[in-house]
């Protein structure tokens, strides 16, 4: 069974030395994949040499986007305003290849795009700072154009997998946010606009597959409420399953998605670590008891593709502007526990 580690390097800037430390730890622990999450509301941490993007609706200059984004209540950027250049990313990808760690880049659409949309506010979904308006043809083209631009680069560097995120669309639409009271997928499921997400999901999968990479995404909007009425969705996408939701966010169950033919990655929220997770450094015992066949709400999935331990940087400022060095050093204990657990399967 495949093992993976997800790092939120979008909210928090992790410099090349910190990322190499993590890659070393992953290589020593025999963890197969390193999902490198590069974009969120609090930060956009990677700039290509050419940051212009053209769609049928115009040409966009993205050069001022990379760096810190904005605060959302207790969730804030690290304050460094730093990002990786293309030369940095070339070095990171080459180091991963040298160490035998397969890096999965993640550019998140259609949600968690807040840092980017600060520069293009006319493309926002209604009442949301964080998410693009998929229902607007320009917004749809913008999101897919962004993914295509970065997919071209990562494919050219030999990446075999790429994630387009797809979690928590418009989770900020309720005035009570950052409390997750009303969520975008719940709204568009009921108002008929979920069809636009199905279109985006399938187009994203095609973009990545057409470049000979395997697509990944979080499961949030996929057959929401165990319902296929909005259309078939591309089962080539590996689904990273993190939560069965709550009263106002009723995601599909893991066994239902597996039955539809999706390769399932157990990204269980119960073993999340990171900045803002209380005493996360002490989670080695919890990780040691993790069963990758048991998804959220004790749902068992036979033959999952693998499991992923996630490190999120919701409170990216907690370690100061240290370029991720502290977290890179501290995460080793939990990562090694995860690796030993996965070797049993």
Label every PLM stretch briefly.
Residues 18-41:
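Catalytic domains of carbohydrate-active enzymes, especially glycoside hydrolases
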Residues 3-18, 28, 129-138:
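Active-site mouth loops of central-metabolism enzymes
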Residues 2-6, 33-35, 100-104, 159-163, ...:
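Structural preference for beta-strand elements that scaffold enzyme active sites
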Residues 8-12, 39-41, 108-112, 167-169, ...:
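Active-site beta-loop-alpha junctions enriched in small/polar residues
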Residues 27-28, 97, 155, 209:
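Non-catalytic positions within long, well-ordered alpha-helices that form the structural scaffold/packing
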Residues 41-97, 112-140, 170-192:
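Aromatic- and acidic-residue-enriched carbohydrate-binding clefts of CAZyme catalytic domains
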Residues 121-238, 242-256, 261:
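Active-site neighborhood of glycoside hydrolase catalytic domains
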Residues 215-220, 228-345:
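Flexible, acidic glycine-rich loops studded with aromatic residues
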């Amino acid at each position: 069974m495949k093992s993976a580690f997800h790092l939120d390097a979008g909210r928090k800037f992790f410099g090349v030395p910190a990322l190499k430390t993590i890659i070393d730890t992953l290589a020593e622990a025999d963890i197969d994949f390193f999902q490198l999450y590069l974009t969120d509301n609090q930060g956009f941490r990677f700039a290509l040499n050419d940051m212009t993007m053209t769609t049928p609706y115009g040409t966009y200059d993205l050069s001022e986007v990379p760096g810190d984004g904005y605060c959302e209540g207790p969730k804030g950027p690290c304050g460094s305003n730093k990002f990786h250049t293309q030369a940095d990313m070339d070095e990171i990808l080459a180091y991963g290849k040298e160490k035998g760690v397969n890096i999965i880049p993640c550019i998140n659409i259609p949600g968690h795009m807040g840092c980017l949309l600060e520069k293009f506010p006319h493309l926002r979904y209604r009442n949301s700072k964080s998410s693009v308006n998929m229902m607007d043809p320009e917004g749809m083209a913008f999101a897919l154009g962004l993914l295509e631009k970065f997919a071209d680069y990562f494919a050219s560097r030999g990446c075999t997998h790429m994630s387009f995120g797809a979690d928590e669309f418009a989770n900020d639409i309720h005035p009570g946010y950052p409390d997750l009271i009303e969520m975008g997928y719940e709204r568009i499921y009921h108002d008929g606009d979920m069809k636009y997400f199905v279109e985006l999901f399938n187009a994203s999968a095609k973009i990545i597959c057409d470049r000979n990479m395997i697509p990944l995404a979080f499961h949030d909007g996929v057959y929401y409420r165990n319902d296929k009425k909005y259309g078939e969705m591309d089962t080539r996408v590996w689904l990273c399953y993190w939560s069965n939701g709550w009263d106002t966010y009723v995601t599909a169950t893991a066994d239902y998605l597996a039955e539809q033919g999706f390769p399932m990655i157990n990204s269980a929220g119960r073993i999340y670590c990171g900045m803002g997770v209380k005493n996360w450094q002490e989670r080695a015992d919890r990780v040691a008891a993790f069963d990758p066949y048991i998804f959220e709400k004790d749902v068992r999935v036979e033959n999952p593709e693998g499991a992923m331990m996630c490190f999120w940087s919701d409170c990216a400022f907690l370690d100061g502007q240290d370029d991720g060095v502290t977290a890179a050093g501290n995460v080793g204990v939990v990562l090694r526990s995860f690796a030993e657990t996965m070797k049993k399967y």
